[in-house]
Structures are given as structure tokens and as C-alpha cells.
Amino acid sequence: KRQPKQSRTGYVTQESHKHFFVDDIDHPYNDDENKFNWIRGYHVGGRSLTWGRHTYRLSEFDFEANLKDGIAVDWPIRYRDIAPWYDYVEQYIGVQGRPEGLPQFPDGKFLKPFELNVLEQHMRESISKNFNDGRILSNARTAHITEGTKPGLGRVTCQYRNRCMRGCPYGAYFSSNTSAKREAKL
């Protein structure tokens, strides 16, 4: 009842995590003409608490698209220029994932991937067996610690409790609260 505009998205309506988002009554905005579904956070840590933690590298395709398509302005850098920084960030925040060798999704410095469940593993094997055109099923690359710890930052391995949207008490997923804020105090 206090978030009528944000609840249109279906994202902020769960009791477990709606406290992360702005009260539309106390903090209104006018969207009558275009019905913009603006999800607005109201918490220390900003969007780093609610971003979903999907972490993909841009590829050479992304950096060269404007030049090849002849539209807009060409990027002044290429993937190879920032690849070392992707490595640094992935190691700092702890990105889990499966190296797949896909040029459109460059591999990185991943922690061990979350295990696929039985159905996902069966689908992965079936796709591999029945299609030889490069199709795959892979898990998402997300900023979750799946092995080891970052104890100085108060972060430990994911406990697989499916409570991510409530805010991880273990610091297993990356957020500014579990990492950057703590490190700034050290």
C-alpha cells in the first residue's frame, strides 16, 4: 500500500525485501504520462544491495560495434585495454562462473561455479549431445563467494540459503556494505 508505483514491477513487493525500497507516499514522483516504473532504493549501500550481482564482461564485439556498424562514436578503448581491470575487479568482488570460451562473454578470473541442479545438468548434457552449433547451457556469472573466504572483509562462502534479497548476513555476495565500506574503515 505504501509502494503503489514501485509495486507495478513485481520486484519490490515481497515482505522480505521491500524495506530496501522507497515509500512512494513519503517520496512521490509524477509519472502519469509515461508510467515509468522506477525502482528506487532507500538504504545504505545503494544499488549494490539490490543489483542481482550478475557480472558479465563486455567483449570485443561490444567495443567494436559502433565502428563496424558505422553509427555513433567509436569507443576510445578496446577490450584488451580493460581486461586486466576486469580481472582485478572479479578477484576483489568474488565472481563465480564457468569458463565457456564464448567470444561474446569473455571468460574471467572466476571462483568455482554454483553447481547445476539435476534438471539443469540434464539439459546441459542434452543440449551438448543434440546440438553441435555452439549452444550451451551455463549458469550465470555472479558476484558470490563459492570457495575460500575474505575474512578481513567479513565475507565467507555462500551458504546456499536463497535469502539473497534479504541482504546476506555472511557477506557472500558482493555489496558495498560487505566489502568497500568495511575496507574503507580499515
Predicted feature descriptions by range:
Residues K1:
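Glycine-rich FAD pyrophosphate-binding loop
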Residues K5-V22, H27-N37, Y42-H43, G52-R57, ...:
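Conserved redox-cofactor binding core of oxidoreductases
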